[in-house]
């Protein structure tokens, strides 16, 4: 007979049958899974029926990003425990719904408050705000119809109605707005985002700084030039008809894509015009 699951805000840590550091928060299971190069990832599962000591890596299917070490794993699990505790206190109500949404028929709704409803569909999902609620959204972020998709735009709801979300959700929402709509964030909050505080703003800076540089748009380990990565690059990573394209050879140890692409150093990286491993260049 299985032991009862801990309450949503209780945490249990242990080791799996294959030696992984694991944890349980309510019915959500977590594991610190090894990857290549000594890295680790936070993986999750739902409602594993066996005791913790019988879990294996194969039980986990969700992926929540990279972990630096065991301390980072424990911190992430405790953060989730706090998130679940706060979410329970918010009193969100699950309802049956077949409402029409931009992503198809609703398969269920979660009511956060009067006029703030989240819909799940077969393909996607998102929030619907009533007209009164939507008028409270800042005009720089407001959508005309009051629909906000679940991947990115949900964050607009969270920063507009922060009392309806957990601290974890609010932190994620702030990060999402800064990354996706830095101009709106700066305009609304009267601040300037510094390098590293907004992915979109950093991307623009990268593109401006490297507009005339050769940036790799495709790469493959070369069979014709052993010990090199064959790359295809264009100025500023531009694509489309009429774009000048060149190939360069790069040592594998040097080739790291980075956040926005690999910039060719013409003083170090050799222009290549020989046989290619790319289809269309042969």
Model-inferred region functions:
Residues 206-282:
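Eukaryotic intrinsically disordered, low-complexity regions
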Residues 3-6, 25-29, 35-49, 58:
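Extended, charge-biased low-complexity segments
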Residues 109-110, 117-121, 135-144, 171-198:
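A solvent-exposed interaction/effector surface
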Residues 1-21:
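Short Lys/Arg-enriched alpha/beta "domain-start" segment
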Residues 61-71, 151-196, 249-282:
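Short, compact, well-ordered microdomains
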Residues 48-50, 118-142, 238-248:
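A short, structured beta-strand/loop element
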Residues 67-108, 189-215:
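Surface-exposed beta-loop interaction hotspot
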Residues 54-69, 141-149:
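A short, exposed loop/beta-hairpin motif centered on an aromatic-Gly-Thr core
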């Amino acid at each position: 007979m299985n032991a009862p699951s801990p309450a949503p805000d209780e945490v249990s840590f242990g080791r799996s049958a294959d030696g992984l550091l694991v944890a349980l928060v309510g019915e959500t299971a977590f594991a610190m899974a090894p990857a290549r190069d000594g890295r680790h990832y936070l993986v999750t599962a739902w409602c594993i029926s066996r005791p913790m000591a019988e879990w294996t890596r194969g039980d986990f299917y969700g992926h929540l990003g990279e972990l630096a070490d065991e301390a980072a794993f424990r911190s992430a699990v405790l953060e989730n425990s706090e998130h679940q505790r706060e979410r329970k206190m918010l009193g969100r109500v699950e309802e049956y719904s077949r409402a029409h949404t931009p992503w198809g028929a609703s398969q269920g709704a979660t009511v956060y408050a009067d006029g703030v409803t989240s819909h799940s569909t077969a393909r996607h999902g998102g929030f619907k705000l009533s007209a009164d609620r939507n008028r409270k959204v800042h005009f720089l972020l407001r959508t005309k119809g009051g629909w906000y998709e679940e991947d990115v735009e949900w964050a607009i709801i969270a920063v507009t109605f922060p009392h309806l979300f957990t601290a974890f959700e609010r932190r994620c929402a702030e990060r999402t707005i800064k990354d996706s709509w830095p101009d709106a964030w700066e305009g609304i909050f009267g601040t300037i985002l510094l390098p590293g505080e907004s992915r979109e703003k950093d991307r623009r800076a990268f593109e401006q700084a490297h507009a005339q540089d050769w940036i790799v748009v495709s790469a493959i380990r070369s069979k014709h030039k052993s010990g090199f990565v064959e790359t295809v690059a264009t100025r500023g990573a531009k694509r489309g008809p009429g774009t000048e394209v060149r190939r360069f050879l790069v040592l594998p140890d040097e080739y790291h894509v980075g956040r926005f692409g690999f910039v060719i150093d013409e003083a170090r990286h050799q222009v290549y015009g020989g046989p290619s491993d790319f289809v269309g260049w042969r």
